Amino acid sequence: MAWTKPIIREIECGMEINMYGPENEDRHDDRDDLF
């Protein structure tokens, strides 16, 4: 099976990466973080 070059498509996405962070800046070490 030959390797084929993947097609790169740029898509519009309304979500930003900062949505997945904490809602406020008050961070606690005892809380489970996403990363």
Curated annotation (Swiss-Prot):
Organism: Roseobacter denitrificans (strain ATCC 33942 / OCh 114)
Entry keyword Ligase: no
Keyword Nucleotide-binding on entry: no
InterPro entries, per database record: PQQ_synth_PqqA (IPR011725)
Keywords assigned: PQQ biosynthesis
Pathway assigned to this chain's UniProt record: Cofactor biosynthesis; pyrroloquinoline quinone biosynthesis
Pfam family, one: PqqA
Gene name in the database record: pqqA
Top-level taxon of the source organism: Bacteria
Family designation: Belongs to the PqqA family.
Cross-link (Pyrroloquinoline quinone (Glu-Tyr)): E16-Y20
Function: Required for coenzyme pyrroloquinoline quinone (PQQ) biosynthesis. PQQ is probably formed by cross-linking a specific glutamate to a specific tyrosine residue and excising these residues from the peptide.
Protein name: Coenzyme PQQ synthesis protein A
Entry's Gene Ontology BP terms: pyrroloquinoline quinone biosynthetic process
